[in-house]
């Protein structure tokens, strides 16, 4: 997935965890401070939000519990949008919905009622 500077983000949400998925493997394919300056993957732990990209660099593998509230803070919000410019790249290996299966639910937005 590509989160372009000036526009890329992902709303805070949780992903389903169950027999179809117990962990979300994420491959960091860019480095904060080189490919983008601000924003990044955030997770909530014990009521506090942490920016994961402050601790990883390109090539690192992140193993995350999808049930943790998470999202992507807007990447370089001070920059103008440029699809072919800088930004944040990641490889995501999650299974959020098995096609044709009602056993695996979809992601749940944090602001859902």
Which stretches of residues belong to each language-model region?
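Catalytic core of Fe(II)/2-oxoglutarate
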Residues: 21, 32, 36-113
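Conserved double-stranded beta-helix
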Residues: 1-33, 92
């Amino acid at each position: 997935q590509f989160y372009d500077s000036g526009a890329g983000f992902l709303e805070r949400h949780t992903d389903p965890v169950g027999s179809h998925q117990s962990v979300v493997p994420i491959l960091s394919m860019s480095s904060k401070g080189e490919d983008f300056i601000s924003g990044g993957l955030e997770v909530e732990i014990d009521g506090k939000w942490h920016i994961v990209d402050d601790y990883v660099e390109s090539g690192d593998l992140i193993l995350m519990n999808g049930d943790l509230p998470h999202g992507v803070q807007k990447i370089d919000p001070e920059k103008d949008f440029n699809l072919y410019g800088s930004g944040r790249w990641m490889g995501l290996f999650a299974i959020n919905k098995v096609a044709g299966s009602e056993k695996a639910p979809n992601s749940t937005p944090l602001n859902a009622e």
